[in-house]
A protein has these predicted regions:
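A short, polar/charged loop-to-alpha-helix boundary motif
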Residues: 44-57
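Short, basic and Ser/Thr-rich N-terminal targeting/leader segments
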Residues: 23-27, 73
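Small-residue (primarily alanine) positions within well-ordered alpha-helices
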Residues: 12, 16-19, 29, 55, ...
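Zinc-dependent deaminase
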Residues: 1-19, 83, 90-155
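Short beta-strand scaffold segments in enzyme catalytic cores
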Residues: 27-35
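Residues that line or immediately flank small-molecule/substrate-binding pockets and catalytic motifs
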Residues: 45, 79, 103
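Helix-adjacent hinge/juxtasegments
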Residues: 57-90, 94
Length: 155
């Protein structure tokens, strides 16, 4: 592992430690581009009662605000723990090109800090997942077409 990776992973771990000391969950994340830290985040679920307030999500939001764009192409994310499926999806949608994490799901499992079961559930077809997921078509096909027209007017 390079010194750069080590430095940013240690920063994510320090954020997690500081967050834990303040009563939060032990997760921190750092968004980096070109060797520069764009943003950091910690898990704020307990403080905000927001189940999406994961460290990676907070860091992605802050980086996007700083750049004035949701496009985080060329960025790397360093996380203290194995990113959950929600965070992985957000990083992919934002264009993050690289993710490194310090602690695995296996290391977190004995402490209730693993999302391996969620990954396993999501790997199943919708009909076999633990959540009831249904496609319920509605008679309003114009919604997406209207959005596309609005985007074309902006261009």
């Amino acid at each position: 592992m390079s010194d750069t990776n080590t430095r940013f992973l240690h920063q994510a771990i320090e954020l997690a430690c500081d967050n834990m000391a303040q009563g939060g969950r032990p997760f921190g994340a750092v968004v980096v581009r070109g060797g520069e830290v764009l943003a950091t985040g910690v898990n704020e679920i307990l403080a905000t009662q927001d189940p999406t307030a994961h460290a990676e999500m907070s860091a992605l939001r802050a980086a996007s605000r700083r750049l004035g764009s949701p496009d985080l192409s060329g960025c790397s994310v360093y996380a203290s723990g194995h990113p959950c499926p929600m965070c992985m999806a957000a990083m992919r949608l934002a264009g993050v090109g690289r993710v490194a994490y310090a602690y695995s799901n296996e290391e977190g499992a004995p402490f209730g800090l693993s999302t391996a079961a969620v990954y396993e559930d999501l790997a199943q077809p919708f009909a076999e997942q633990s959540m009831d997921i249904r496609h319920l078509p509605v008679p309003r096909p114009e919604l997406y077409a209207q959005w596309a027209q609005a985007q074309n007017r902006k261009a």
